C-alpha cells in the first residue's frame, strides 16, 4: 500500500516546484517533506523527482501524480455525496484542473462550462497554452483534461473529437489600403506574398504556428521569415490588429462576436486555416470530471464546426 502522506508530499512538491514551497503548503517542516519523499522513493525503488532549481517529476513521478489527483477527486466526490444528504448548506467545493488554448477558452469553453460549475459547486483551475502543447500538462499529471490538436490518445487517456475551429487571416482596413498599391510577385487571390512577408504579423506567442500554417497552406511558403509582434492576450491581440500593427489569425467565433469593435478585413476570406480539436482526459474519470467532460462535449457540439 502506498502511504497517503508520502503521496501528498510528492504531489505538493511537483505542483509547487520546490520542497520549501511544498512544506509551506502542507504546513509541515522542510525536513518532513524530504523524509516523506525519500521514504516513498525507497519503497518504490526509483527516483520520483529530478532535483534542481525547479524540481520536476520523473515519468514515474508523473504517473503517481495522476494517481494522487484521481484519488483526491474521487474522495471529494464521496464527501460531496455525503454532505449533500446532510444539513450542511455550504459543502466543500472541488477543484478541477484543465489545459485550454486561449481562443477556445474565450469563445466557447468557458461559456460552455460555467453553468455546470455553478450547479455542482465546482472550481476550475485553467492552464492556458497553445492548442499544440496543452497535452503536455495532461501528460505531466498537472491537469485532468485538455483541449488539444493531438488526436492520438495518450497513455491512460481518451481522446474525443470536438470539432474544428476555423481561422481567418485579418487586418485593419487602413493596412489593407496600403496593400492595394501595385506589387509584383507571387499572388493568391490578389494578395501578394511579398506584402505579407514585408508586413509584421501579430502572433499570440512563440508557440503560435497559425500564421506559418496560413503561409504554407495557401502560398506554399515553408519556414518563411517575416517580422512579428508577440501579444499574448486575446483582447490585446485583437486590439493590435485594430491598430494596424500587422496581420494575424482570428477564429470565426471571435470575429462573429466583434459587433461593437472596429472592423477587421478578411485577407483571402475563402482560404481559412482549419484546426481540429480534441478533448483528451483521464480514462478513469471521477464523477466531477465526467460531468465536466459532458459539458465540454455539449459546448463543442454547439459552437465548433462539425466537418
Where do the PLM segments sit?
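Short helix-boundary/capping micro-motifs
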Residues: 11-29
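Residue cluster at the C-terminal edge of the helix-turn-helix DNA-binding motif
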Residues: 16, 25, 41-47, 119
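Residues within the DNA-recognition helix of helix-turn-helix
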Residues: 29, 36, 112
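A short LG(V/I)-centered, amphipathic sequence patch enriched
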Residues: 41-59
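Alpha-helical linker/hinge and terminal dimerization helices associated
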Residues: 43-44, 64-89, 296
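C-terminal regulatory
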Residues: 159-245, 257-272, 302-307
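A late-sequence structural motif
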Residues: 265-307
Amino acid at each position: 500500500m502506498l502511504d497517503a502522506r508520502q503521496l501528498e508530499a510528492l504531489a505538493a512538491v511537483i505542483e509547487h516546484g520546490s520542497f520549501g514551497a511544498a512544506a509551506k503548503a502542507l504546513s509541515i517542516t522542510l525536513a518532513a517533506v524530504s523524509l516523506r519523499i525519500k521514504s516513498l522513493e525507497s519503497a518504490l525503488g526509483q527516483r520520483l523527482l529530478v532535483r534542481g532549481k525547479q524540481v520536476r517529476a520523473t515519468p514515474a513521478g508523473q504517473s503517481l501524480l495522476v494517481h494522487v489527483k484521481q484519488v483526491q477527486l474521487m474522495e471529494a466526490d464521496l464527501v460531496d455525496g455525503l454532505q449533500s444528504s446532510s444539513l450542511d448548506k455550504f459543502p466543500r467545493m472541488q477543484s478541477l484542473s484543465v489545459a485550454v488554448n486561449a481562443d477556445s477558452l474565450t469563445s466557447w469553453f468557458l461559456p460552455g462550462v460555467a453553468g455546470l460549475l455553478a450547479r455542482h459547486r465546482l472550481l476550475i483551475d485553467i492552464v492556458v497554452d497553445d492548442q499544440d502543447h496543452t497535452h503536455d500538462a495532461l501528460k505531466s499529471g498537472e491537469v485532468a483534461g485538455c483541449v488539444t490538436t493531438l488526436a492520438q490518445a495518450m497513455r491512460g487517456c481518451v481522446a474525443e473529437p470536438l470539432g474544428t475551429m476555423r481561422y481567418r487571416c485579418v487586418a485593419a482596413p487602413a493596412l489593407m489600403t496600403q496593400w492595394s498599391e501595385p506589387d509584383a510577385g507571387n499572388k493568391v487571390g490578389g494578395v501578394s506574398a511579398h506584402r505579407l512577408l514585408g508586413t509584421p504579423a501579430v502572433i499570440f506567442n512563440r508557440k503560435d504556428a497559425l500564421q506559418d500554417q496560413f503561409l504554407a497552406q495557401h502560398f506554399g511558403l515553408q519556414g518563411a521569415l517575416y517580422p512579428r509582434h508577440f501579444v499574448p492576450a486575446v483582447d490585446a491581440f485583437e486590439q493590435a490588429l485594430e491598430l494596424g500593427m500587422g496581420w494575424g489569425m482570428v477564429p470565426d467565433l471571435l470575429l462573429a462576436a466583434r459587433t461593437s469593435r472596429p472592423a477587421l478585413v478578411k485577407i483571402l476570406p475563402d482560404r481559412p486555416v482549419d484546426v481540429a480539436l480534441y478533448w483528451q482526459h483521464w480514462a478513469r474519470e471521477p464523477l466531477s470530471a465526467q460531468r465536466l467532460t459532458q459539458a465540454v462535449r455539449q459546448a463543442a457540439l454547439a459552437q465548433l464546426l462539425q466537418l
